[in-house]
């Protein structure tokens, strides 16, 4: 009976040693750190790699140092100009001090989520609707700064905050659609008015030129008649003013005088 008893005791001792070694050996990945507690007191952070702790007397809490993505659930709030909105966001953060993340707050992920929700409601409540829709980058930076300052004592670094979706009441959406349509019509009217102004300016310049050179209008009229007459299918009926007839007579007389001078030169 002595042999079985010794075998049983040896087995128990070996099993205890294996359990002791399994509890003493710790392997921490490259992106992790182990916060070591000895008899309830923090003695520091270890890792990455292999290390040993004293079971029963020491305890290791593993902390992930990678950037984590935290979805902030939809928050219902009212903007500064009294427009009810539903907004959600996403927060990117990482642990930079694992000891603080373990000792300064019970659950740093939940705490970061809660502070992100309250900050989102606060910032949106201080902004106008136009800012929320058109200056989202500015609000993102403001959110990132406030949340980062609030979580800094926990060893957390907030790297970015992005507002994802902004939901407006149906009535507000229709009103904004009408406003956008009115804005497009206003711009179209401004463009048309500018074109008419430029056309009027050109007409004014032309009128000034014609008033300074009356013959220019008559020559332009003759050019137009010539262009129309080039098409043989057109039948032209002209009601010419006296000034135009006088112009024709002057041109005819000038042509006759010129022809007479040419003949005299030939005789000489």
Swiss-Prot record:
What is its subcellular localisation? Membrane
Q: Which Gene3D superfamilies match?
A: 6.10.250.2090, Band 7 domain (3.30.479.30)
Q: State the UniProt keywords alphabetically.
A: Coiled coil, Membrane, Transmembrane, Transmembrane helix
Q: Does the keyword Coiled coil apply?
A: yes
User: Transmembrane residues, as ranges?
Assistant: 1-21
Coiled-coil segments, which residues?
Answer: 125-152, 178-213
Q: Provide the topology term for how it sits in the membrane.
A: Single-pass membrane protein
GO cellular component terms? plasma membrane
* Xref: PROSITE patterns: BAND_7
**Disulfide bonds listed in the record:** none
* Any Pfam family the entry gives: Band_7
SMART domains attached here?
A: PHB
Query: What superkingdom heads the lineage?
Result: Archaea
> Assembly state and interactors?
Homotrimer.
Return the similarity comment. Answer: Belongs to the band 7/mec-2 family.
Please state what the protein is called. Answer: Stomatin homolog PYRAB06580
- What species is this protein from? Pyrococcus abyssi (strain GE5 / Orsay)
Ranked from the top, the taxonomy reads: Archaea, Methanobacteriati, Methanobacteriota, Thermococci, Thermococcales
């Amino acid at each position: 009976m002595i042999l079985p008893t010794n075998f049983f005791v040896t087995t128990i001792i070996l099993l205890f040693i294996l359990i002791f070694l399994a509890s003493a050996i710790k392997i921490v990945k490259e992106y992790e750190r182990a916060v070591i507690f000895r008899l309830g007191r923090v003695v520091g952070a270890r890792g990455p790699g292999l290390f040993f702790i004293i079971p029963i007397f020491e305890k290791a809490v593993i902390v992930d140092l990678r950037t984590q993505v935290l979805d902030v659930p939809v928050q219902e709030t009212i903007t500064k100009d009294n427009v009810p909105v539903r907004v959600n966001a996403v927060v990117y953060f990482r642990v930079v001090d694992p000891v603080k993340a373990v000792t300064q707050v019970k659950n740093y992920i939940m705490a970061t989520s809660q502070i992100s929700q309250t900050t989102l409601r606060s910032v949106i409540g201080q902004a106008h609707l136009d800012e929320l829709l058109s200056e989202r980058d500015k609000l993102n930076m403001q959110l990132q700064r406030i949340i980062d300052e609030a979580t800094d004592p926990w060893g957390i670094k907030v790297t970015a905050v992005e507002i994802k979706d902004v939901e407006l009441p149906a009535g507000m959406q229709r009103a904004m659609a009408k406003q956008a349509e009115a804005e497009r019509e206003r711009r179209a009217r401004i463009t048309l008015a500018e074109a008419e102004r430029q056309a009027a300016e050109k007409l004014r310049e032309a009128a000034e030129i014609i008033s300074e050179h009356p013959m220019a209008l008559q020559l332009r009229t003759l050019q137009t008649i010539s262009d129309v007459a080039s098409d043989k299918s057109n039948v032209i009926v002209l009601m010419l003013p006296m000034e135009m007839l006088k112009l024709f007579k002057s041109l005819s007389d000038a042509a006759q005088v010129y022809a007479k001078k040419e003949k005299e030169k030939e005789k000489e």
